[in-house]
């Protein structure tokens, strides 16, 4: 197999690693394919401006989520997850914005190259962290809805914060190992190891994380459907969890197809690199919109504060009008539990 352009570009001798590849394409290279199997045409010049505009909009949205979920809204187990998810998405979008900004100008020298390499490493780490948080959110939400009494009685204190810390640590370790084999060992010494790391990352993302986020969502949908037959209104938090998982699955289709076709059938990628990266940026930018749409009160014609909208998106249980005929509201149960359980 010829030289592999891994998830992150090689730190030295880039021309040898990716001969004939334009700088723009090299920056947007996702890395699953060898140079012989990716298109040599660079992305359109307008792509950099689209990336920058999308990243800036996503940074504003995730910044609002960080502010309201972190300082303005009472902490709940799931607001902790969404807080870390917004942090991962915000840092990822910032790294992509830096790369797009460098791509738009003629920045030469060692310092811009160093910034590009650091931005790629940070982007990979935060992308992995954001994806790994989705299974944790899906599983915990599924358990809290299907087994509410058991969940709130047995739930360890500070579970959300502990899980988020472990997932960030896992992301840091995986990214460090990947960059050790694909960047610091040198291209000649790390070719096979870097290739195996790319395969391992794909297996981890598509064959472990995706099932772990999809199966709990399916169980949640079945449970919500059963409640709908009893005329019980579903919690808005269920809609939020299902929506953010669906957005990720849709936005990662192109990346998954490219990876699957190449590693299973040895078929070149049918989609340009910048298309898959654009979809991932859309995924990172869309979550604040999901929170807003889920928390918006359709009957409220006047403008509502964003704090109220985001707080309503975290509503866990039936609407007030249905409280008498619904199962125990997990928000009420949360208020009855020690404050440490909301961490």
Curated annotation (Swiss-Prot):
Any single GO CC term annotated in Swiss-Prot or TrEMBL for this entry: plasma membrane
Name this protein carries in UniProt: Mas-related G-protein coupled receptor member F
Membrane topology: Multi-pass membrane protein
Family from the record: Belongs to the G-protein coupled receptor 1 family. Mas subfamily.
Glycosylation sites: 4
One GO MF term: G protein-coupled receptor activity
CDD domains: 7tmA_MrgprF (cd15109)
Tissue: Gut, vas deferens, uterus and aorta; barely detectable in liver, kidney, lung, and salivary gland. In the brain, markedly abundant in the cerebellum.
Biological-process GO terms, alphabetical: G protein-coupled receptor signaling pathway
Membrane topology (Cytoplasmic): 67-82, 145-160, 221-241, 295-343
Gene: Mrgprf
Keyword Transmembrane: yes
Extracellular side: 1-44, 105-123, 182-198, 264-273
TM region positions: 45-66, 83-104, 124-144, 161-181, 199-220, 242-263, 274-294
Pfam family, any one: 7tm_1
Domain of life: Eukaryota
Keywords linked to the UniProt accession: Cell membrane, G-protein coupled receptor, Glycoprotein, Membrane, Receptor, Transducer, Transmembrane, Transmembrane helix
Subcellular location: Cell membrane
Free-text function comment from the UniProt entry: Orphan receptor. May bind to a neuropeptide and may regulate nociceptor function and/or development, including the sensation or modulation of pain.
Region (Disordered): 318-343
Comp. bias (Polar residues): 324-343
Major localisation: membrane
């Amino acid at each position: 197999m010829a030289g592999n352009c891994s998830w992150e570009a090689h730190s030295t001798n880039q021309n040898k690693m990716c001969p004939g590849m334009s700088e723009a394409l090299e920056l947007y290279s996702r890395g699953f394919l060898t140079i012989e199997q990716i298109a040599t045409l660079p992305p359109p010049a307008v792509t950099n401006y689209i990336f920058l505009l999308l990243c800036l909009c996503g940074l504003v949205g995730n910044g609002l989520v960080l502010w309201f979920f972190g300082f303005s809204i009472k902490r709940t187990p799931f607001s902790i997850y969404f807080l870390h998810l917004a942090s991962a998405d915000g840092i990822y979008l910032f790294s992509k914005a830096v790369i797009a900004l460098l791509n738009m100008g003629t920045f030469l020298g060692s310092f811009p190259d160093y910034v590009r390499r650091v931005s790629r490493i940070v982007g990979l780490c935060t992308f992995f962290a954001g994806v790994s948080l989705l299974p944790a959110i899906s599983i915990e939400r599924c358990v809290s809805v299907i087994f509410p009494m058991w969940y709130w009685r047995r739930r360890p204190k500070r579970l959300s914060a502990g899980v988020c810390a472990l997932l960030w640590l896992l992301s840091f370790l995986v990214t460090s190992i990947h960059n050790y084999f694909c960047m610091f060992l040198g291209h000649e010494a790390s070719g096979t190891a870097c290739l195996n790391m790319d395969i391992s990352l794909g297996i981890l993302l598509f064959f472990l994380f995706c099932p772990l986020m999809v199966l709990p969502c399916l169980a949640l949908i079945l449970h919500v459907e059963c409640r709908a037959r009893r005329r019980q209104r579903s919690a808005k938090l269920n809609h939020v969890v299902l929506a953010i998982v669906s957005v990720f699955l849709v936005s990662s289709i192109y990346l998954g197809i490219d990876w699957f076709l190449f590693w299973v059938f040895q078929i070149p990628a049918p989609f340009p690199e910048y298309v898959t990266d654009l979809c991932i940026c859309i995924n990172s930018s869309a979550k604040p919109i999901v929170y807003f749409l889920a928390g918006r009160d359709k009957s409220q014609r006047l403008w509502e504060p964003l704090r109220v909208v985001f707080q309503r998106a975290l509503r866990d249980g039936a609407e007030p009008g249905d409280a008498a005929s619904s199962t125990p509201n997990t928000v009420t149960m949360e208020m009855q539990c020690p404050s440490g359980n909301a961490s």
